[in-house]
Amino acid sequence: MSKSTAEIRQAFLDFFHSKGHQVVASSSLVPNNDPTLLFTNAGMNQFKDVFLGLDKRNYSRATTSQRCVRAGGKHNDLENVGYTARHHTFFEMLGNFSFGDYFKHDAIQFAWELLTGENWFALPKERLWVTVYETDDEAYEIWEKEVGIPRERIIRIGDNKGAPYASDNFWQMGDTGPCGPCTEIFYDHGDHIWGGPPGSPEEDGDRYIEIWNIVFMQFNRQADGTMEPLPKPSVDTGMGLERIAAVLQHVNSNYDIDLFRTLIEAVAKVTGSTDLGNKSLRVIADHIRSCAFLVADGVLPSNENRGYVLRRIIRRAVRHGNMLGAKETFFYKLVGPLIEVMGSAGEELKRQQAQVEQVLKTEEEQFARTLERGLALLDEELAKLQGDTLDGETAFRLYDTYGFPVDLTADVCRERNIKVDEAGFEAAMEEQRRRAREASGFGADYNAMIRVDSASEFKGYDHLELNGKVTALFVDGKAVEAINAGQEAVVVLDQTPFYAESGGQVGDKGELKGAGFTFAVDDTQKYGQAIGHLGKLSAGALKVGDAVQADVDEARRARIRLNHSATHLMHAALRQVLGTHVAQKGSLVSDKVLRFDFSHNEAMKPSEIREVEDLVNAQIRRNLPIETNIMDLDAAKAKGAMALFGEKYDERVRVLSMGDFSTELCGGTHASRTGDIGLFRIISESGTAAGIRRIEAVTGEGAMATVHAQSDRLNDIAHLLKGDSQNLGDKVRAVLERTRQLEKELQQLKDQAAAQESANLSSKAVDLNGVKLLVSELAGIEPKMLRTMVDDLKNQLGSTVIVLATVVEGKVSLIAGVSKDVTDRVKAGELIGMVAQQVGGKGGGRPDMAQAGGTDAAALPAALASVQGWVSAKLQ
């Protein structure tokens, strides 16, 4: 029986829930636990720390439908998307996971039951093939003896990638760490499609398609390459939703499943395309999925890192829309149809629909302004191309000047059977790439980061001073047993009052003290379940096992608490004033300021800013108790607690409430009552990206300082105007009105002087074949007056060519005017260009009027002297 994609997703989750698995929501496309990843690209990403032993959950079995993006970095499918049956920038990975619970037997039996069970997917058993790692006899025997697959459909795959354990059937997290063999399940579409089984010379065909990969994590790879058995083996599986949907819906291409058919029809509608087989429709249908969900997860178009990948995908989609004949912005119109086809997986996208649409529309409009010019330039270059390769320098110029990603240029070239010199492009990009590498940590070895086996207990909600024991020390990322005075290090304690940076709140500062030593803590960070105190040993020596007294900087923490509580009040106030579309997109809570990024499509009006301030200060005056409760995540959401989308929460969460005004999930530190905040003031509101606004605000003493500073400025101004602050507005208005009157009188005098100068100049014109030529350098004339003078002179002289120049602060300003009856022979733009070139400048304009600037004032006399000969030649 054919199932819809949404039904397949739900059936998978229901099946594993019936087998005792916790259904875990998809994590954000922006990984929050792995700096080595650009985007979430597999179901196991959100559980990586669990597999590494750095995190623990209150369940040992889990199942997910994880949103993934593969575009940029190691997994870059972008150039193939739309041109093959199964490449996507965005896909959903169905997965089931065991954290030291079941292993090979149950994992294989679960997979077989779901795929072939009459009440589940009911696939014909004879169509299923499997592969196992060459030496994994255990998995082989389970498939053969327990499941009953014939030997000829079980294929052993060895180290087929040129190194020990380098195999399609051996999975490794990195050079070190958890790894193990895997078994893959393939579906045979039938002999009407070309291709051979896995491991055969024809394996790249489309007949045998991998639908499920089951990884058995049973080893811990050491730095020397040896494999140590894990004490608790685990299971990580992944099945592409789109692939299994194609199988269950009896189609050979992912783009023919119900989800994509609906999206492709929507793309055709908004672009005006009638050919539903056009590959550009497939490209756009794929790209709207990745782009919409990336924006919903907080990624915005930019020229670096994740934002640049998003920009590349958007621009590729827009360019394909251009190829289909789209005459206006269209891409953002696909968000609505996408939400409809995603079903329950699109709920968060629906909540942010307006924001996502605005970001996509703005980016498309920006690109549309350069797309036409960029394509025209590329067409010119391709038309004069000798050979079949476009040079990298041209590709870079398109990128640098017109914002064309190189893969978009390659797309255009591929349609004409032309290659792009990507090596040349990379050479031209090297400086930017070097800077990007320095600024980004993406691609670092996850396993080389600080890893702490022990956990730290945070007790800073109730204590600012605590005795603890050193459980680990790190210098330059490496574990050490002891440090001496002057050394910088990371100190891990068994328990600590220091808050580690999280949720936008900065880490605590303070001191660790003990017998003969003092360690100054400049920052506090999380390392898995451990809390690291970063700083410098200012005196004595410190070693693992030492007892310490941990003292948090109390005054600094107090200011942070006020700012964090005020952030919650402001978030609630923004949603009241601007609407419930407001969602947090980033925050910083420090001891000096609070910064809050949120979704909103326009600048806030002064009245809205004042209303938010008033609402927050009203809650401060109410002196509400700030209460925290620990409860189940579902119960917290039912209570109305706001959760940050994409943030990882445990099943038991901390709910922070301020009366009936604000309820949020939060692990940060807060004031006891809203009245402790004292005063709240917004000091700035600005835009950070399309659809994202930023507010900076201060509280308590910081807020009072801004009040005093503002009062001092008003008093200073009043003193300058010889008045007092009470009638300051009237005084300023009077001064501005007097200034406007004086400026008007001054302009009248300048106009009179220019008119008189024009009258004097007209007598200096010379006759060239019936055309009056006037060339003059003017002293003491503002550049903006030159245009008025040219208009006056054209009226006085009739058939004429005029060139005027002036020099102000070493900069040359030029203007050329040509009467209409002469423009067929002398064009002002060409004339001014000739003169400007001689004075180190450039310019242009209409045939009858053109302007230019230059930097070489010394060359001006000679440049003006050349005009008569140039004009005379044109008039012959």
From Swiss-Prot:
Q: Which family does it belong to?
A: Belongs to the class-II aminoacyl-tRNA synthetase family.
Question: Which InterPro entries does the record match to this protein?
Answer: aa-tRNA-synth_II/BPL/LPL (IPR045864), Ala-tRNA-lgiase_IIc (IPR002318), Ala-tRNA-ligase_IIc_anticod-bd (IPR018162), Ala-tRNA-synth_IIc_core (IPR018165), Ala-tRNA-synth_IIc_N (IPR018164), Ala-tRNA_ligase (IPR050058), Ala_tRNA_ligase_euk/bac (IPR023033), DHHA1_dom (IPR003156)
Q: What is this protein called?
A: Alanine--tRNA ligase
> What's the Enzyme Commission number for this chain?
6.1.1.7
Required co-factors: Zn(2+)
Gene3D superfamilies xrefs: 2.40.30.130, 3.10.310.40, 3.30.54.20, 6.10.250.550, Bira Bifunctional Protein, Domain 2, Threonyl-trna Synthetase, Chain A, domain 2
Which is a GO BP term held by this UniProt record? alanyl-tRNA aminoacylation
Which is one Gene Ontology cellular component term of this protein?
cytosol
What is the free-text note on the cofactor?
Binds 1 zinc ion per subunit.
Name the SUPFAM superfamilies for this protein.
Answer: Class II aaRS and biotin synthetases, Putative anticodon-binding domain of alanyl-tRNA synthetase (AlaRS), ThrRS/AlaRS common domain, Translation proteins
Q: Which UniProt keywords apply?
A: Aminoacyl-tRNA synthetase, ATP-binding, Cytoplasm, Ligase, Metal-binding, Nucleotide-binding, Protein biosynthesis, RNA-binding, tRNA-binding, Zinc
Task: Provide the assembly information.
Answer: Homotetramer.
The entry's free-text remark on domains says:
Consists of three domains; the N-terminal catalytic domain, the editing domain and the C-terminal C-Ala domain. The editing domain removes incorrectly charged amino acids, while the C-Ala domain, along with tRNA(Ala), serves as a bridge to cooperatively bring together the editing and aminoacylation centers thus stimulating deacylation of misacylated tRNAs.
- Intracellular or extracellular location(s): Cytoplasm
This molecule's function is given as:
Catalyzes the attachment of alanine to tRNA(Ala) in a two-step reaction: alanine is first activated by ATP to form Ala-AMP and then transferred to the acceptor end of tRNA(Ala). Also edits incorrectly charged Ser-tRNA(Ala) and Gly-tRNA(Ala) via its editing domain.
Q: Could you tell me which species this protein originates from?
A: Salmonella typhi
Reading the lineage from the top rank, the first entry is Bacteria
| MF-aspect GO terms | alanine-tRNA ligase activity; aminoacyl-tRNA deacylase activity; ATP binding; tRNA binding; zinc ion binding
Q: Which residues bind Zn(2+)?
A: H564, H568, C666, H670
Give the catalytic activity. tRNA(Ala) + L-alanine + ATP = L-alanyl-tRNA(Ala) + AMP + diphosphate
Q: Which NCBIfam families match?
A: alaS
Cite the Pfam families for this sequence: DHHA1, tRNA-synt_2c, tRNA_SAD
